[in-house]
């Protein structure tokens, strides 16, 4: 913590502020809260999470996590399951629980009191879950359905986030950028309004996976796209918001492949193509975010073996492709195109 205090202080001497990544949709399964919940299923900490009884020897509902397989993991020795939108090591926090919310607000204000300048709010549109967490018709051969049906951008999410804002960062001068998957054109402006937005700005992702078919975005379920498609998706939100809202603009992040390989045809993956991509997003209205390595035009890693990939979602997507009839070579090629590890390599000096 001494290092962090020094970083904040030295940054302020230079008229700079530190933004932190704030993850409050879920926590680690090693977190003290979750361990206490497991130790005492009827205790107060169990209410911090989504524990549900299984049904007929199966999970409480048929949600598929974003990293593959059921979004419910069984607690050993019981008939209870816990919900995880992402990996099983990341149990979702129950924001309907008032005590949980108070703990989060206390933690956020503690960091703000230390002098943090603001936050990137991770997976923030997943905080509100559908009441009852019901099953839906399956959307795949595995009999499951995307967890988004019960967890993404649910009614009431804006009211919940406004309470969050008003109890924490909204009380002081801060900068906040929301990772806001699932926002619709009808709700976008209320999140980024310069007058009363939930956040200072949001990342807008509608154009980041044009090559994949929703809502599951399986890497093998691909579609063709054109520069006109990119232009339409890229500009539509900006045209709608006009001068009433503000965006965080990016073409790369830790969840996406490198933009040179992602958006440019093979013959355009050079200095001129990279300069064009940079011009495209640096000239948009908003605050540009340059992802690590993007400033030197880093490329996808394209490893030759699955043994070289670490990302859990990459291995799940690879296995999913194999299960649906793709050869190991075809599945590996999909991984080389889409893996999150493409953006997580050391600097390519």
Which residues does each predicted region cover?
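Active-site and adjacent substrate-binding regions of carbohydrate-active enzymes
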Residues: 1-349
